[in-house]
C-alpha cells in the first residue's frame, strides 16, 4: 500500500517547539485518519531545527465502501393515512433516496423510519489534501508569529512543503495572504554542509535522502548520536560527561548533523564553586561539563574541559573549539571577578541594598518582604514549639535569605540565587544550618526537584511562599486559567509538599489568617483575601491528592468536603491529617473494606440531615434521652454509641483511622436491626420528641464517621 510524506520546511524553529509539535501530531494525526476510516500500517514523526515531518506508511488508496444507516422522523410523522408527509419527503431528499427505500422499525422510543445509504469511499489523496493544511495550521505553542502578509501564525516562516504520495507529488498549496507555498518533492539539506535543494524520489526514501545531505531527521537518532559522541570524547579526556536531561533535550533540536567538540580552560578557574562553572557551561553556553572519574571523586570534581555539540563542519573542530574556549574563558573570568568582589564583604552587609530592589510596586521592596518573611517564620516557630537555638537560626536564615540577590554574581547569573547565598553565608561565618537554609528555602523549585532537608530551609521556605501568596491575593491578582505570573500555584504546591515531606504539624489556615490581617493593616484600602485563599489552597490540595498521591476524586471530595466549610477548615488546619485520611480511604477501597461500613453510614446520614444535631457532637449522653426509647434496638444503638466515643477520639488523636472503621463495622448489625430488625423503629415518628431522639442517634453515628470523611461524597463501588 502507498506511503505519504509531509515535510514542513521553516526557518530555525525554537528548540522546545520541535518536540511540542511532534507530540501534537502524534496525538492528532492518527485520530484524524481514523475518523476518515483510514488505518495506516505505521506512522513515523521527524523534526529538526528547520523542518517538521511525518511519514505515514501503508495507507489504503481509498476508503472502504460502506453502508450508513440514518434514522429519520417517527413513523406517525413520516406517514399520514399511509402516504408520505412533507417531513418524510424532506428527509429522503436530504439523504438522496426515495420514499420507497425507507423502512419502519420498532425502537425503545416507538416506530421510526430508517434508510440505508451506500457510501462510496473517497480517494485517500483527496482526504489528505483536506487534512494536511489542518495538521499544519492547528499546531499550538508559545511565541507564534505572523509571517508573510496573511493571518497564518507559526513559530517561524514556512519556506517549503514536501507532500509525496509514494513517488508522486500530492498537489497542495498553503496560502497566507499574497504568500503562497506550493508543495513539491524538493527539500533542503544542511544549511552549511549541503545547502542545495534535495529531490526526494519517493516518500519512503525521505530519511535516507536527507542523511546524504547531512541532515538526520530523527530526533531519537540524533539523541543517540550525541550521547555516544559525548561519552566517547569524555573518555578520551579521562573523565565522564555530565549530561543534564534538559540540556540534552534542547541540543537535540538545535542541530541537524551533530558533532561533539571538546574544549578546555585554565585549571585556575576550578577554584570557583562548581555550581558557578556548571551554570556558565550548561545554562549560558549549552556545554556539557566533564568531571573526574574514579571512587576518589566523591565531590564530583570537575575537570578543566567542556564538550559542545556543533552543527557545522566536523572537520573544523579545532576552529570551533577555539571560538568556544574564548567565550567560556571570558565568562569564567567575569565570574571569578564577581566571586572575589562578593566575598570581600559579609553577606549581612548586602541587606541595605535590598531596599533598592522592588518586589512589587504596591508591596514594597525585597527588604520589606524579608521583614514579612521573618515575622511569618516566627509564627511557624511558635506553632512548632521550637527551642531558642532553632528560633535563632531560623531568624538568621530569614534575614539573610534574599541577601545574595544584590551580589554581583547573582545579578549576572540569576539561576544561582540561594546557591551563592549558601556559599557567602559560610564564608561570612554563619552556621551550616543557616547557610543550608538560605539555599533550601527555594526548594522545591519545580515538580521533580529535591525537597529541603533542613528545618531552617523548610520554615523559611514556607514563610516566603505564604507571604507571596497572601500579598498577591490581597492585591486581587488571583491566578487564572491563562495566567499565573507570580507562580502562586507552584508556591502553594510547594507549601503542601514541604509540609507533607517534613511531617510538619502546622496550621496553614492560622498562618493565612494572620498574614491576611497583617496585609489589611498595612493596606487599609484593601479587603482580606482569606476566603479566596481558602478556595485556592483547597483546589491545590485536591489536585495534589489526585495527581501525586493517586487518590480517587470522590475520596478527595470526601476528605475536603464539597462546599463544606467545616471540612475546609479542618483540612487547612492539619495538612498531615487530610493526607492520611485520604490515603486510608483509598486503602480500604482497594481492599473493599469500605463496603462493610458504606451502607450503614450513608443510610444513617441521609436520614440524619432531617434532624438538627450539630455535626461536631459525638457524646450520646448530651443529646439522647433514654426515657423516650420504645424499642430495645434504640437502647442497643445508644450503648454502642457510648462505647464508640473513646475509640473515635483515639483514632482522631493518633490518626489511626483503622480503629474507627473497625468499630463502625462492628456497629453495623446494631444499626441494621434499628432499621429492619424485629425491634425496628419508624424514625420519623409522629411524636416529635421521639423523632428527634431517633434522628439524634443517627446523627451521632454520622458525626463519628465524619471524623474520617463525608461518606455522602463517596461514590458506591
From Swiss-Prot:
Entry GO terms, CC: cytosol
EC code(s) of this entry: 6.1.1.14
Enzyme class: ligase
UniProt-listed SUPFAM superfamilies: HD-domain/PDEase-like
Keywords attached to this entry: Aminoacyl-tRNA synthetase, ATP-binding, Cytoplasm, Ligase, Nucleotide-binding, Protein biosynthesis
Chief subcellular location: cytoplasm
Molecular function (Gene Ontology), one example: glycine-tRNA ligase activity
Keyword Zinc-finger: no
Domain of life: Bacteria
Compartment(s): Cytoplasm
Any one GO biological process: glycyl-tRNA aminoacylation
Catalysed reactions, as listed in the record: tRNA(Gly) + glycine + ATP = glycyl-tRNA(Gly) + AMP + diphosphate
PANTHER family cross-referenced by the UniProt entry: GLYCINE--TRNA LIGASE, CHLOROPLASTIC_MITOCHONDRIAL 2, GLYCYL-TRNA SYNTHETASE
Subunit structure: Tetramer of two alpha and two beta subunits.
Entry's family note: Belongs to the class-II aminoacyl-tRNA synthetase family.
Name under which the protein is recorded: Glycine--tRNA ligase beta subunit
Amino acid at each position: 500500500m502507498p506511503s505519504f510524506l509531509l515535510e514542513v520546511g521553516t526557518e530555525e524553529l525554537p528548540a522546545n517547539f520541535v518536540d511540542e509539535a511532534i507530540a501534537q501530531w502524534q496525538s492528532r494525526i492518527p485520530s484524524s485518519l481514523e475518523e476518515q476510516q483510514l488505518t495506516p500500517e505505521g506512522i513515523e514523526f521527524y523534526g529538526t531545527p528547520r523542518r517538521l515531518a511525518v511519514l505515514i506508511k501503508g495507507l489504503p488508496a481509498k476508503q472502504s465502501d460502506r453502508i450508513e444507516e440514518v434514522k429519520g422522523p417517527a413513523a406517525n410523522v413520516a406517514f399520514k393515512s399511509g402516504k408520505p408527509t412533507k417531513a418524510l419527503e424532506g428527509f429522503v431528499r436530504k439523504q438522496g433516496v426515495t420514499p420507497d427505500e425507507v423502512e419502519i422499525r420498532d425502537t425503545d422510543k416507538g416506530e421510526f423510519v430508517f434508510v440505508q445509504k451506500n457510501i462510496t469511499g473517497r480517494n485517500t489523496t483527496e482526504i489528505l489534501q483536506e487534512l494536511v493544511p489542518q495538521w499544519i495550521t492547528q499546531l499550538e505553542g508559545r511565541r507564534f508569529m505572523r509571517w508573510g502578509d496573511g493571518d497564518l501564525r507559526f513559530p517561524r516562516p514556512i519556506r517549503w512543503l514536501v507532500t509525496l504520495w509514494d513517488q508522486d507529488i500530492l498537489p497542495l498549496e498553503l496560502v497566507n495572504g499574497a504568500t503562497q507555498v506550493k508543495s513539491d518533492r524538493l527539500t533542503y539539506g544542511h544549511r552549511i554542509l549541503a545547502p542545495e535543494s534535495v529531490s526526494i524520489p519517493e516518500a519512503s526514501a525521505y530519511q535516507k535522502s536527507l542523511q546524504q545531505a547531512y541532515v538526520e531527521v530523527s530526533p531519537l537518532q540524533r539523541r543517540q548520536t550525541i550521547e555516544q559522541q559525548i561519552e566517547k570524547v569524555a573518555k578520551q579526556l579521562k573523565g565522564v560527561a555530565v549530561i543534564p536531561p534538559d540540556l540534552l533535550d534542547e541540543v537535540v533540536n538545535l542541530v541537524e548533523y551533530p558533532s561533539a567538540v571538546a574544549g578546555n580552560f585554565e585549571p585556575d578557574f576550578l577554584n570557583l564553586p562548581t555550581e558557578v562553572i556548571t551554570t556558565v557551561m550548561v545554562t549560558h553556553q549549552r556545554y556539557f561539563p566533564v568531571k573526574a572519574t574514579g571512587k576518589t571523586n566523591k565531590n564530583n570534581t570537575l575537570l578543566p574541559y567542556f564538550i559542545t555539540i556543533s552543527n557545522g563542519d566536523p572537520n573544523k573542530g579545532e576552529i570551533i573549539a577555539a571560538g568556544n574556549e574564548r567565550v567560556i574563558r571570558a565568562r569564567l573570568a567575569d565570574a571569578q571577578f564577581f566571586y572575589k568582589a562578593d566575598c570581600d564583604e559579609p553577606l549581612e552587609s548586602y541587606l541595605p541594598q535590598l531596599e533598592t530592589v522592588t518586589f512589587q510596586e504596591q508591596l514594597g521592596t525585597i527588604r520589606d518582604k524579608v521583614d514579612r518573611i521573618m515575622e511569618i517564620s516566627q509564627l511557624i516557630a511558635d506553632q512548632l514549639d521550637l527551642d531558642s537555638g532553632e528560633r535563632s537560626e531560623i531568624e538568621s536564615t530569614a534575614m539573610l535569605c534574599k541577601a545574595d540577590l544584590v551580589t554581583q554574581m547573582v545579578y549576572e547569573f540569576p539561576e544561582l540565587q540561594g546557591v551563592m547565598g549558601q556559599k557567602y553565608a559560610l564564608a561570612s561565618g554563619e552556621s551550616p544550618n543557616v547557610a543550608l537554609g538560605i539555599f533550601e528555602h527555594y526548594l522545591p523549585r519545580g515538580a521533580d526537584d529535591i525537597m529541603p532537608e533542613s528545618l531552617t530551609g523548610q520554615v523559611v521556605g514556607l514563610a516566603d511562599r505564604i507571604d507571596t501568596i497572601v500579598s498577591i491575593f490581597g492585591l486581587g491578582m488571583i491566578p487564572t486559567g491563562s495566567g499565573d505570573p507570580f507562580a502562586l500555584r507552584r508556591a502553594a504546591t510547594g507549601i503542601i509538599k514541604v509540609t507533607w515531606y517534613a511531617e510538619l504539624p502546622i496550621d496553614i489556615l492560622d498562618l493565612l489568617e494572620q498574614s491576611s490581617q497583617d496585609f489589611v493593616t498595612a493596606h487599609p484600602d484593601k479587603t482580606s483575601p482569606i476566603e479566596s485563599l481558602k478556595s485556592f489552597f483547597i483546589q491545590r490540595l485536591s489536585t495534589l491528592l489526585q495527581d501525586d498521591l493517586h487518590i480517587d476524586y470522590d475520596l478527595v471530595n470526601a476528605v475536603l468536603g464539597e462546599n463544606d466549610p467545616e471540612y475546609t477548615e479542618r483540612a487547612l488546619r492539619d495538612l498531615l491529617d487530610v493526607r492520611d485520611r485520604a490515603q486510608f480511604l483509598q486503602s480500604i477501597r482497594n481492599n473493599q473494606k469500605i463496603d462493610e461500613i458504606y451502607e450503614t453510614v450513608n443510610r444513617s446520614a441521609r436520614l440524619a440531615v432531617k434532624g438538627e444535631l450539630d455535626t461536631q457532637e459525638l457524646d450520646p449522653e448530651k443529646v439522647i434521652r433514654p426515657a423516650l426509647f420504645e424499642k430495645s434496638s434504640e437502647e442497643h444503638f445508644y450503648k454502642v454509641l457510648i462505647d464508640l466515643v473513646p475509640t473515635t477520639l483515639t483514632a482522631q488523636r493518633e490518626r489511626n483511622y483503622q480503629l474507627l472503621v473497625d468499630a463502625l463495622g462492628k456497629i453495623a448489625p446494631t444499626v441494621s436491626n434499628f432499621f429492619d430488625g424485629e425491634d425496628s423503629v419508624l424514625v420519623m415518628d409522629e411524636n416529635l420528641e421521639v423523632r428527634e431522639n431517633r434522628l439524634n442517634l443517627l446523627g451521632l453515628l454520622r458525626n463519628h464517621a465524619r471524623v474520617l470523611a463525608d461518606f455522602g461524597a463517596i461514590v458506591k463501588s
